[in-house]
């Protein structure tokens, strides 16, 4: 595992948009490989999807994930009176499977426990992230053929 003390978050700014697009693309390119599209078509589609996603969550806490001071990912969290909604967590490819995502989710779990709120999220049904969230204690709470709804409940005392 990477040194967790070198992991931090900062607020995303408009200047981060090129980096955020890079992170988003790194999570989507593989699934587009089977479409038979050119690289230009893939990039245009990803940019369109990225901009639509940006407009979908205007109220969320949009954070840049920093490791050793370098931007390595993004975390989108929507907090309301009933729950904490994890809208997105994504790391650049070379920073995945190093324990960084787990550390951030565990920090969010501590926040949820302190607030007495569940954490909810949606994940693509076929994504390896389903197993990641299950290992962290999330359970399936609904969904459809495309997306699973998952929930983590803080322990009650």
Role assignments for model-derived ranges:
Residues 61-75:
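Conserved beta-hairpin
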Residues 82-93:
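Conserved acetyl-CoA binding element of GNAT-fold acetyltransferases
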Residues 112-124:
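Conserved GNAT acetyl-CoA-binding A-motif
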Residues 102, 126-147:
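Conserved active-site alpha-helix within GNAT-family acetyltransferase domains
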Residues 1-15, 154-157:
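Conserved N-terminal entry element of GNAT/NAT acetyltransferase domains
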Residues 28-54:
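Conserved GNAT-fold acetyl-CoA-binding loop/helix
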Residues 8-22, 29-33:
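A short beta-loop-alpha structural element at the N-terminal edge
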Residues 91, 97-110, 135:
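Conserved acetyl-CoA-binding loop-helix of GNAT-fold acetyltransferases
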